[in-house]
Each structure stands twice: as structure tokens, then as C-alpha cells.
Amino acid sequence: MTTTFKDASAQEIAQVMEKSWQAFLAYKKFSLKQRADFMRAIATELENIRARVIPVAMEETHLPEGRMNGELSRTIFQLNDYGKAAEEGSWLEARINTAGQDPSKPDLRKMLVPLGPVVVFGASNFPFAYSTAGGDTACAFAAGCPVVVKAHPAHAGTSEIVAEAIVKAAKDTGMPEGIFAHVHGASFETGKALVMHPLTKAVGFTGSLAGGRSLFDMAGQRKEPIPVFAEMGSVNPVFLFPEKLKQDGEAVAKTYAASITQGVGQFCTNPGLIFGVEGEDLQRFLGVLAGELQKVAPANMLHPGIAKAFWQKRAKALEQKDVHTEVAAAGEAEALQGVPTLASATATAFLNNPVLHQEVFGPYSLVIKCKDANEMLQAVLHTEGQLTSTLMATDDDMQKHPELVDAVQNLCGRLVMNGVPTGVEVCLAMQHGGPYPATTDSRFTSVGSDGIKRFARPMCFQNFSNHLLPEELQNANPLGIWRTVNDALTQSAL
């Protein structure tokens, strides 16, 4: 049975933020190893609660056991991986320029230092990996920041169990009181109070464009504006090039049917737009894709709110002028279910109707029929920023259409060739972020240890005595980290 949690009051939030600030003053002085040990302890506790938390997560999200176990394992991996990166220290971007033999020059040493308390909003579609102990939380801890998590009300019980595991790990590793806090709040006011509190120094968010933009605007209206790192979804356009479509159109269609319906389409990297040039090859692709989608049964979505939004946005998209429905379930599906849906429209309709650009979160995709490559280019130039874009193309296709390839590259943070955008690898080379409205800051990623940098700022120390410097910048390099010394990357001591 789902447990109901009371929204945190303004007074409770104020107390939480004050404790978080006091924890920051202590935690920022903890060593990189201490941070890493804390994160590894959280990972261990998450493994310890696996048997207890998985059934709760399954009940709250309607996600299957295999998916839940896999996501929890990914969350554990993230904590260990980001902890290792924190300890290794290259993310600090330590820079040293010594005065040398010129007494008129200062000794300058720069590194990243933590921002302060970070508020993290749990995501609805990833109860582990993007929520209470997820990537934003792990990155903030690695950067030296305390974390205050606002649980997502759709899986509040899961979040509560995970929060208990973090608190235990904090106690076991001697972390300062207030290093982590967990609050509930289904109301808008709870989130607003957290963002607007003067001791909040950054926000991490994964969710809708409306939600992320609201937090971003609030943060900008503060007396002291703060960064909001919001990942707000994407339609992840796919561009079918002529030779590739002719050679492998049927296989590509089958591959994309699986991608569109994976997890009932509830991934921020779900391919919601597919562009191709009109002709027999595109029609054959469309026919195979439609046939494959019709084989996929409706399934329960994460929670009633997401299901309701899917049906409303789906209906709005399908009722637009010049939109042809290719696949849609007959009659009414159960209220909580998402049904595989495919539509098509001309590029002219896409260019003239902003509704066709909008994300329909769920198992939905829209095929855009272009007259030729030039019209496809025009469509690209009128497409908003994305997390991913995909080129289904041969090498010859790429060489014949360089302007189109360049334009697609400008859209996104991750450019995929001959693959699917669903599936986000946790590694240093991953970029999970893109131009607005995909995210509020395309310079950063929310996946991979480079995401640690979101919650830190550069600090330069000028003419400090060596023993007064942070260990990371001292002459002997006692931590053995990589540093750029007088413009040369090295691990050596000065």
C-alpha cells in the first residue's frame, strides 16, 4: 500500500537549509578520499536495501523487476564511479602558474571549489538513477556540497527508503550533520521554498519543460540568482538519409519500433521525430514501422499524471491539421496505459505548426515527410535544441550532405550515427545535455563524472604560502592528482 507523506512546511525547510549550510562549512574541508568513502558507503547501503526497496519501487512506478534491479545497479555504479573520479581529482582542473624568476609576476593557483547546498528534485521516470541517490546527488557530494532532496510524490516511499540508506552511510562515515536531508512536497510551494531559500546555492532537476523552466525563472528572480541545471526532455529527432534508407530501411524501422516503445516510451531520449525524404523507400519504412508498432501491446505508464499527459498531448498532436494517424489503438485504453502511436505529416506542416515540435512523453513518434534534402535542412534549422539527434546514413550520405550534417550537429549534445538514442552510458565521454529547451545549460552533462563540475566554481589563490594552500595546489602535490603547471599537464611535484 502506498504511504502518504506530509509536505514539509516553510519552517521545516528553513531548518533543513540552515543545517545544510552548517554542514557545507565543514564538508568542504573534507578530503577527496573522505568524499569518495562516503559515496562508496551509500553504494553499499543501496545494495543492502535492494530486497526491501525493489518491491516498493515496482508498486509505485509499475516498472518490472528487471528494470528496477538494473536501474538500482546503475545507481550504485554511479556512486562508485563518481566517488572514484572525485578522489582522482582531475575534475578539479587544478592550474598553477608560478612567478618564476620575475618578481613582478604573482604566483597564481586555481581549482574548482564547491558551491554550497544543492537542492535536487527527484525525477518521475527514474526512481533510483535520477532521484534521491541518483546522478545529481552523487555529483554534488563529489563536488563537496551537501544535498537536500525533494522526493518525487509519484514514488515517495521508494525515495524515503533510499534516503534512510544515505543517512546511515553518512553516520557510518562521520559526515557532518545536515550533509543530506530529505523532504516531501506534492505542492508547488514546497519546491518554490527550497529554490528561493537564500542558503540554496544550486538546483538539479530532471523533468518537464514547464517544471524546469519554472524553477529556472524562480532562481533568476532571487536577490542572489543561482544556477539551475535542468534537463527538461527532448524529441530526439532522427534523420533518415537516402542511401541508408534504401539499403537498410526495413531493419532501421524494426530497430526504431523497439526504441520508441522501450519502457512504454518513458525515456527522455525517446525518438519522437523521424525525418525522411518522400518516396517509395520512406513509404516502405513507414509501413514496416507501423506494422511493428501494432505488435506491441499497451502497458501501464509510471503514474496517472504521466498517463493523463500522454493521452492529452497525443490527442492534441493527432488532431492537428495535415497530421495523418498511422498507428493508434482503437477505442479507449485503460486510464493508466500508454499505447504505441505513430503519425506522419509533411515538412510544410512541421514548419508551420509549433505543436508538431512538442514532446509527447510516451510511446509516440511522428514521421516528417520532406520533399528533398533541402527541405529537410529547412526543418532542421527550425527545430529546437535536443539532448540527442541521430543520423541514419552511409558514409556517402554524409559526404553528399555536409551542410545538413552540420546543421543537425548544432541541435544537440549527443550526435548518434546509425544507432538509437535510448540508452545513456555512464562514462566520462557521455554528454547528456543539449541546447535549450533540452536543458538550461548545454555546457554541462548530467551523466558521467564531468557532471561534478556543475556544482563547483573556480577559485584562484594568489601569492599564498605553500602550507596555507589546499593540498590540491601545494608544491609537493601530496594527492598525486593531474595538474596543469606552467601550461604543462603533469602529476609531478613543483
Residue ranges of model-derived segments:
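Short loop-to-beta-strand entry elements in the cores of soluble alpha/beta enzymes
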Residues: 38, 143-158, 179, 224-244, ...
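Rossmann-like NAD(P) dinucleotide-binding subdomain of oxidoreductase/dehydrogenase enzymes
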Residues: 91-258, 275, 279-282, 493-494
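NAD(P)-dependent aldehyde/semialdehyde dehydrogenase
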Residues: 254, 276-387
